[in-house]
Every structure is written in C-alpha cells, then in structure tokens.
Amino acid sequence: MDTNKVNIDVFESGEGIPIIYTHGWADDRTAWDGVIQLLSEGFRNIAWSIRGHGESDAPPPGNYTRDHTLGDLTQIVDMANSPVVLVGHSLGGYLSLAFCLKHPEKVKALVLIAAGPGFRKEETREQWNASVRASAKEMDIPDGSEEAALHIDSWVIDSLSEISAPVLVIVGENDKRFAASMAVFQKYLDVRESVVVPGAGHSVHRKYSSAVGSAIQRFLSILPS
C-alpha cells in the first residue's frame, strides 16, 4: 500500500469487524500472527508494518515523525470503510491513542497492550528519548527511524479524558514499566476490562498470543454491534 510515496506492508485476512493491528518500535506486523490466527473467524484482520520496519519502505531521516506515522495509519483505517477496533502494542498503543484523539469517529474500540500514554514532564520525556537514541545506535534499523518512538510533547497523556471509545488494557505480569500505565488508563479512559497475563513480559502478544487473543475476543463480544 502506498502512503505518501512510501510503500507500507499490509497483511489482511478474514471478514467481519475490522481490527487494525499496530506493532511496537523495532518490530513488524508478524508480531500479530498468533493473535490473528485465533481471531480468524468473524473479524477482518489488518496488520501493518510501520514505515522503516519489516517490509515497509524506509524513507530518509526526517520522515518518521508521529504525524508521518499517523498519516499512514489513517490511510490504513480508511481501507475498512467503517469504524475499526484499534489494537496496539507499546508504541503501537501510543499511536492508537493519538489516532483516537484525531479521528474519534473512526474508532469503535481500543485495545492497549503493554502501552503507555507518554509523559507530562519534559525531563522524563528527555530521559526516555535519550534511552531510545542510545538503543537505536546498537540496533540494525534504518537511519532516523527511531524518531517514531520519541516523545515530543505531552499531548496524548494530557488529552486522555477526551477519548470515549471503550478500552481493553492488557499487560504482562513482569512488564513493570508498562504495568504502571494501567492505573492511568483506568483513571482517564473508559476501560471495560484490564488483563494481567501471568508470567508474561513486554512481548506478551508474541509469547502469550492465545491469552491475548482470547481477551480481545471476549472484550469485543460484549460490545454493542
């Protein structure tokens, strides 16, 4: 799929309620294979790789901002031609929150997996960004693609209460950094269910895809059609 002259790798399968899957930083759409297999009946599953990840194009540095990525996500959501369920892991969860703020009418429900809402304090954002940049130097990723994982402001966390879509929160028992975000989501979002997966870490959707898929299936079954 071409979005603004950048080819985005998209996988689609099934028919029914459209679900858009957005992975985390330095991952790709195959992270969702196990979950999608479990949700093969009754759902139109659409997984994509963020620009600079997986089989998607890697444009030059300066083309990986939040707005660039949200622009790609918008075009993918529009493929569904109806409100979608957004499922996001880590960075993908943050981007899904941002998308909800920009296009609330396009979102039926939201599933946040090992995700965070960003940071209010500039000092904390700078610490996070420094950690991302340091990690990027040690990784085999396209130049500049780490920009997608940087936090430039507190817009998302400051605006959480504006999101009205029903939410499912999933986190691994051992993922302490992102487990702390659960209380924030419960305070500001319409969280219908929170699931802690025993023994799981940050990649809960990969290693415990059955538990994650079952939680999503249960959550969507109780939502109005």
For each predicted feature, which ranges?
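Conserved acidic catalytic loop of the alpha/beta-hydrolase fold
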Residues: H68-V84
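Short beta-strand immediately N-terminal to the catalytic nucleophile in serine-hydrolase-like folds
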Residues: L86-G88, I113
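Flexible "cap/lid" loop of the alpha/beta hydrolase fold
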Residues: Y94-K102, K108-A136
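Active-site nucleophile elbow and catalytic-triad environment of alpha/beta-hydrolase enzymes
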Residues: G144-S159, N174
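Short beta-strand/loop motif that positions the catalytic acidic residue
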Residues: I163, V169-V171
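Conserved alpha/beta-hydrolase "acid-adjacent" motif
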Residues: K176-S181
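Catalytic histidine-centered segment of alpha/beta-hydrolase-like enzymes
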Residues: A200-S209
